[in-house]
C-alpha cells in the first residue's frame, strides 16, 4: 500500500483548559478534492460525530481529555484516496504503570465535517458513531460502540459486535440481521440506496421517511 504524507498545510490548534481534566484540541483541514473520503482507524476513540455540509473542505477536530492528554497526536496521511486518521503517542511517551492505569484514562472524541457524497470508513473496537447527511458510501466496523445514522442518505455496510444500529433514512433497500438482538426494519425493495446491517448482540432499528 502506497502511503504519501500530505504536502498541503495542516491547520493545528491546541487549546489548553485549566480544569481537573485538562483538554487538548487538535484541528486539521484539507481541500475536499484531495481525498474521496475519511478513514478512521483507532481503538482509542470514544465517540465520532460526522456530518455533511456545503463546505469545500474536509475537517477533523479531536477533543482529548485526561491526565496524559498532551501526549496524544494525530498523524494524518492519504492512503488509496482516503484521508487516514490515526492517533498515536508523541515521541518520548512512556506507558504508564498498570497500577496507575485506572487513574490515567484518556477520552478522545472526533468531530468530522465533509462535503456531501464522500466516503466514510471507521474501524474501532471502542467508538460509537453518529452520522448525519448525504454520503457516497459508508463502512463501519464497530465492536462495543453503537452506530446511529440520522437524516441519512447513502449506501454502505455496518457491522457491530455488541452495539446497536439505528438508522433514519429514505428510499433505501435494507438487508439486516442480528443474531441475539431485536430488529425492526423498514425497507424499500426498489430503493435508490442499499444498506447492509449486521450485529451479533445489538438491536437494529430502521425507519424511512417518504
Predicted regions and their residues:
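Short, functional N-terminal and low-complexity linear motifs
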Residues: 9, 88-90, 106-107, 123-125, ...
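Bacterial Sec-dependent N-terminal signal peptides
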Residues: 1-27
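Acidic (Asp/Glu) and glycine-rich low-complexity loops/linkers
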Residues: 23-121, 150, 155-157, 166-178, ...
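Right-handed parallel beta-helix
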Residues: 121-157
